[in-house]
Amino acid sequence: QYIMFNRTLTTILGIICLLTISLSDDKFSSFRELKKISNGMSIIHASDSKVGIIAIHGFYPAYWVGIHHEWVQPFNYLVENDINTFFYKYDWNDCPSSVAVDFNKELNDLINKYPNINQWQVVGHSMGGTVVLFSVLNSELNERIIYNTVATALHMDIGKVPMTTRMSIEKRFEKCPDNLNSFNEAFSKGFKNKLVQWRNVKEFDSQFKKYDFDPYDKEIKNSIVVQFPDSLNGERVGHTSSLYFAILEIVN
């Protein structure tokens, strides 16, 4: 199922969100507060809500300063709207397939700990979405869980990646034989659980715009694809900002 993004709905949601945030104090003022959180599953906010959001971050290069900055605005919005929010942190130098094994254990423990939550939304951003794909690949059917990938590549043609990043990707793929290019059979069959892909226009995605191929251009049977436009409310929808727009839609 392929869905073109609804600009009108997001405009309304954006206005609501701006009003909400302007009337209250943010829980997180900086990415530095998120950076201090230990690896593993952590509670960002607990409430009586029947919905639980589980966030999974992506990869950060060694030179990256604002680690987890992309989650500050989404987390503040979720807290203000009193939605159960959890953050799964991990060593992004580990293989996503290995990370997913630990995540699935943490996810099962979390579901058992919060039986009153009847809908779980797992949201992986960028390489966090790769963790989501390995997670859903090895998950039993659970209709209470919806898996989301945001700004996540679905395949990698290393020969068409700019030289500036090619070497690091080659090293990761050599280290991790189970990688993005291992999903061909799984994608053709589809997954047991519901999967929603939130895709950007490749040319407006800072992570992928210089690639000589479209890493989003891969079909996953029975998944839902939400295609973002190049901009919303005058703001470019890029690799980072698409996460916030996706969260707005997921919880509304």
Segments from the language model and where they lie:
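Serine-dependent carboxylesterase/thioesterase catalytic core
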Residues: 61, 100-192
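Active-site catalytic motif of lipid deacylating hydrolases and related acyltransferases
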Residues: 25-118
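Catalytic metal-binding/acid-base residues of hydrolase active sites
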Residues: 59-60, 91, 151-154, 201-203
